[in-house]
Amino acid sequence: MSTPVIITVAMTGAIPRKKDCPGLPVTTSEQIEETHKAFEAGASLAHIHVRNPDETPSSDPDLYAAVQEGIQKHCPGMIVQFSTGGRGRDQAARGGMLFHRPDMAS
């Protein structure tokens, strides 16, 4: 009998930039594409950080919604977890994306 597991992926993280890791997915489409690859390989939970166009960390609810919609479309059943972390951002900004009702948040 096998033991069920949850494999979590955090495709972007809060700190790295493309200059640190050229393959880092920072745009919405890159994040969706790389998350889909992980889903196809067996991942079942995606921990999401979003970025502004200049690659700085963001709490923009619209960016979170776009990534969430793409994951739901291309990775059916995958658990979507939004990051509410936000170095230097106020609490309201850090939780603004929760309006989009992810499966989880941390």
Regions found by a protein language model. Give the residues of each.
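A structural motif
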Residues: 40-43, 77, 102
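N-terminal small/glycine-rich loop or linker at the start of catalytic domains
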Residues: 1-23
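Glycine-rich anion/phosphate-binding loops
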Residues: 23-32, 62
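Active-site beta-loop-alpha junctions enriched in small/polar residues
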Residues: 10-14, 51-53, 83-87
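Alpha-helix-loop-beta-strand connector modules within alpha/beta enzyme cores
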Residues: 3, 9, 56-82
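Conserved, mostly hydrophobic/aromatic
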Residues: 31, 38, 49, 105
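Glycine-rich, proline-tolerant flexible connector loops at the mouths of alpha/beta enzymes
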Residues: 19, 44-67
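Extended substrate/RNA-proximal surfaces in nucleic-acid metabolism proteins
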Residues: 88-106
